[in-house]
Structures are given as C-alpha cells and as structure tokens.
Amino acid sequence: MKIGILSLVLHTNYGGILQSYALQTVLERLGHEVYVFNREQQYDKTRWKYIPKRFVKRIIGRDVVIFQEARYKKEAPMICQHIWNFRKKYIHEYIIKSFDDIKKMNLDAIIVGSDQVWRPCYFKSQWNVGIENAFLSFTRDWNIKRVAYAASFGVNDWEFSDQETQLVAEAAKLFSAISVREDSGIKLLKEKLNLNSIQVLDPTLLLSRDDYVKLIEKADIGKSSGNLLTYILNPSSKKTTFINEVAKAKGLIPFSVNNSNVKQTAPIEQRIMPSIEKWLQGFNDAKLVVTDSFHACVFSIIFNKPFIVLGNHERGNARFDSLLKLFDLHDNLVVNLDSYSFERILSSRIENKKIEELRIKSIQFLKQFI
C-alpha cells in the first residue's frame, strides 16, 4: 500500500523526527511505500503575533523582531545542518503547501500519529490549520483508509472548543481504527467523542536498541564527553543545581546533547545542534540520564539506562505518567526537586519480555488495519 503519515511538522525536534522515522521504517518492513507529510520551513511564525510591536518599532527605528527573523533565516541552515541531513537521508518527506496537495498522491491510506498530533495548540500553530485536519477532515470525500497510530493528546484534559469537538467528532467517524499513545487518550475519546480505541507503543519503541546503534555506527561519531546524560528542554537554575548534585552524589560526569548555547547573541558555532546520531550516542554512552523530555525517557528505556525525569507540566505530564505506568517506572519521576533523595536506586531493568509483548501488540494493530 501507498501510505502517508501525518504528525506534527518536522523541524529539529529529536523525538518528533525519530518517531516518524521509526513508524516509516516499521511500515516499510511490512512491505508498504511510505511518505511523511511536512511543510516548507517557516521562519516567520511570529509574524502575526508581533504586528503591533513591529509597527511601533518601525516608527521608532528599532525593528528588533524582524531583524531576529531575518538573522535566523540566514543562520538556520548552519544551526540545523546535522538534523536536516538526517531527515534528508532517512525520512521520505512529502512537502505540501496545503492538505489539498495530498490528494494528487493517490494514497491508499493515511496514518495519523504519533506525537502530540491531537493537541490543538501544537497542531494548529505548526500547520496553520484547524485541529479537525488532524482527524483528516480534508479527506471526507476521498476513497482512502484512515488509521490513527499512537496519536497523543499530550494532556489529561480536553483542550478542544465546542465547535472543534463537533468538527473532529464528524471526521473521526471515518477512521477504520484508532490507537493512542497514552491510556488517558482512551478515556478522552470515549467520553468526548464516544469512540473506542486501544493503547499502543510510541513508534520509537517498535524498533530495537540494535536498530538505533546501527544508525550511530553508520555516522561514525566519537564517544560522548561524560557519563551522566542531561537533556533539558526547559532549563532553569534549579534544574542545573539538581543535575550538579546528582552528578556529585553518583560520582558521574555530566554532559549534554543539546546545543551548547541557545542565545541568539552567542557565536553560531555554539548554536549548532548535535546530529540525531550524536543524540542517540548520548544514551548509548550514559550510565544515568536526567531529562524533562518524553522521548528522552523513551530512549532511556530503549537503551536500558536508569533515568530521572523532571516533571514538565508545560509540555504535558500525561505522556510521562502513562509511559512510566506502562513500564512500572513511576518512581523515576521527580516533581519536587527540593525533596529528592540522591541516594535513591533507580529502576532501569525492564523485562525484555514486557517490551516485546507490547511491541508485538502494537505492530499487530498496524498489520490488522493497514
């Protein structure tokens, strides 16, 4: 079958890129021709938000925002070069200007997922369309199979307006099957849309550690600079202090797989993002991981590494709760940094049988409905 994957927009998000890569890979191994929808790189996403400020700044001669956008547009190819190279090499992207462009592909099926594709604030801002499109409303009159794989709402609450709820309810009726990433998603779909669904694994968990090690080996990169991997999406002084205390208590050397400096005033060499393979290498080399990222937790599990996850309410705690419950690792979640005992022994060993059972169940879902 010829299949298209609709997720969030691909740019530089490590987890987002790898989950699309993983789902594409699994589907190809099942014998399908697969494409991942993406849009042309947008540099001016803040345009409308800043119109009043821009007008004032133009009048007084300090058009800071416009200059920042122009600078980013110029520098992005260098800052993002390694990540974009991975996408170009491994992901079969189909660039669209609007969802109408998809019709001419003559697809047999579209899979929605994974990632927080059903979180309105993310999907609408990234694709610049209504959330009903995440439920394939634009395919209403198409002869096509519609399936959701590990789609995520990201949170436990229903973030749709009444009008949006009505629109997605109509669109969702056309799906052949729906699976979600979090157990809370099952409840939301039943309560709000009266739809049945099942829980499946994030696509990245459908591939083995060996699959990711092969990517690392192909890239031929050096060892990481430490053994305490830190991957923090929302940095703060409290988190930095916490990481330093963990390193001291465990006798480990912290290292990061973020770019070393995110300030726009920093030299561009310091803002170049590590490659996907370098990011994966970090998990392979780590003895312990500290993160506030969902997919960093996932890859800690894949590489069988102990990890500490710092609760990240802004990005959706439901994802962490569901994942940790699935693998009985809820003790790894830290909500209050001030009360953490640095002598705690963290779980890292997950029975291979448990992962394999969930993997078989998840792949069987794809085999059955695609």
Annotated model-derived regions:
Residues 1-370:
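Active-site anion-handling motifs in enzyme catalytic cores
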